[in-house]
Regions:
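A conserved acidic beta->alpha catalytic loop
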Residues: 94-105, 121-122, 153-154
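Acidic donor-binding/catalytic loop of UDP-sugar-dependent glycosyltransferases
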Residues: 71, 151-166
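Short, acidic, metal-binding catalytic loop of nucleotide-sugar glycosyltransferases
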Residues: 77-87
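Catalytic donor/gating beta->alpha subdomain of glycosyltransferases that bind UDP-sugars
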Residues: 174-199, 228, 234-298
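Membrane-embedded multi-pass helical conduit in multi-pass membrane proteins
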Residues: 306-382
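Short aromatic/hydrophobic "clamp" motif used to bind/position activated sugar donors
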Residues: 146
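Long helical/loop segments within the catalytic core of UDP-sugar-dependent glycosyltransferases
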Residues: 118-129, 133, 137, 143, ...
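N-terminal membrane-anchoring/stem segments of glycan-assembly enzymes
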Residues: 1-53
């Protein structure tokens, strides 16, 4: 055995053997993510969780609307009010001072007995955060099960509430997918879409094993009992954190239900302008540094191992003997097959489509885009958590 090992070292050198070992280890890390961790999302079934109640509960949908959002009036609110579910209500908290807009909301409210409306003034001197508005919305709601969404998002189905409500049979926190939709299908927009898909995939991969750290802002909920147990949202002066840091305080190993169904999905409109999208991602991603170490490590490890794997493969092709070059190329191809197949299955489960053929573009550029997003703070990022 010693002679064989010495022969290998003499033939390939210590550096060559070390590089080969590094490639194999990094390959193993990548296979763990795409072959095991992310596959859990595709294989997850809510029915595997034990029911805690025997029937779906009444639902209060709560949404905070800031300013004069005409699209909310003409498209989004009718979709919410048109949900096919026996017992639900829509609670709208309007943040603004436009009386005509508020009167239009009142007119709609008068036509729907299951719509509630509250107004919060706000202005240049007094900025009302979303969490402050949601606190008011929760107090106005009449039901125990609360479901949150945002302007700019539309349910994919008239049965959205019905399917999300099934989660409350099995948990007090309910999380469902939300996908980003851009104005066109250019390569730039595909990369942006895949960056958001990867973030959602990471979150769902943790949520299905009871390690919830994030939920889409447009598609999550919890019970009033949990809310009251914390005396409401924390960090009220900060306009972010309600869908991640606050949920991390609420979540336990047994109280989260993940609903993965095309009917439970929500579609969020995104700007196709690069600078606006990057600013959006930076702002809502600025809570990341407050995540626990295990969560941050899970997210970073895939990205770092991917970059190092690519770098090691390039070095191997450049300097190693032919047989090791071929071995490195074979591992790279095998990894990519696993990555694309896993991503295809997970994308279908989360409501994404047309991923496989162009996935190599994101596979190569994704870490660079994430670095660009994380290399600077949003102009609106809060400096102090209070």
């Amino acid at each position: 055995m010693t002679q064989i090992f010495n022969h290998i070292l003499d033939h390939y050198t210590y550096a060559g053997v070390a590089l080969a070992i590094v490639i194999v280890v990094l390959f193993g890390v990548q296979i763990y993510y795409y072959g095991i961790a992310y596959r859990r999302v595709h294989r997850f079934r809510l029915s595997q969780r034990r029911k805690q109640i025997t029937s779906t509960p009444p639902i209060s949908i709560i949404i905070a609307v800031r300013g004069e959002n005409e699209r909310f009036l003409s498209q989004e609110l009718p979709e919410l009010l048109g949900q096919q579910y026996d017992h639900f209500e829509v609670v709208v908290v309007y943040i603004g001072s436009d009386l005509e807009y508020y009167e239009e909301l009142q007119r709609i409210r008068n036509n729907y007995s299951y719509m509630r409306l509250t107004r919060m003034g706000g202005g240049e001197r007094i900025f009302i955060t979303t969490k402050q508005a949601l606190n008011v919305g929760i107090k106005s709601a009449q039901y125990e099960a609360l479901l949150f969404t945002i302007p700019g998002a539309i349910p994919s189905s008239k049965r959205w509430v019905e399917f999300v409500a099934k989660g409350y049979e099995r948990g007090e926190i309910v999380v469902a997918p939300s996908i980003a939709r851009f104005e066109n299908n250019s390569t730039k927009c595909f990369i942006m879409r895949m960056v958001e898909f990867q973030r959602l995939r990471n979150a769902m991969a943790r949520a299905v094993v009871d390690r919830l750290y994030y939920a889409p802002r447009s598609n999550y909920g919890f019970t009033r009992r949990l809310y009251n147990s914390t005396r409401g949202y924390n960090h009220l002066g900060i306009d972010i954190g309600d869908n991640d840091l606050y949920l991390q305080d609420l979540a336990t190993a047994s109280n989260t239900a993940v609903v993965l169904s095309p009917h439970a999905m929500v579609i969020e409109e995104r700007s196709s302008v690069w600078s606006e999208w990057v600013e959006h991602m930076r702002y809502y991603g600025s809570t990341f540094e407050n995540y626990n170490t295990a969560t941050k490590s899970f997210i970073r490890r895939e990205r770092v191992s991917r970059v190092l794997f690519f770098f090691a493969i390039v070095v191997a092709i450049a300097v190693l003997p032919l047989e090791l070059k071929l071995g490195a190329i074979a591992l790279a191809l095998l990894r990519y097959i696993v990555v694309v197949w896993s991503s295809h299955l997970t994308a279908r489960r989360l409501g994404e489509r047309s991923v496989a053929l162009r996935y190599w573009i994101y596979d190569l550029t994704g870490p660079i885009v994430e670095w660009i997003i994380g290399s600077n703070e949003s102009n609106k990022t809060p400096k102090i958590w209070r």
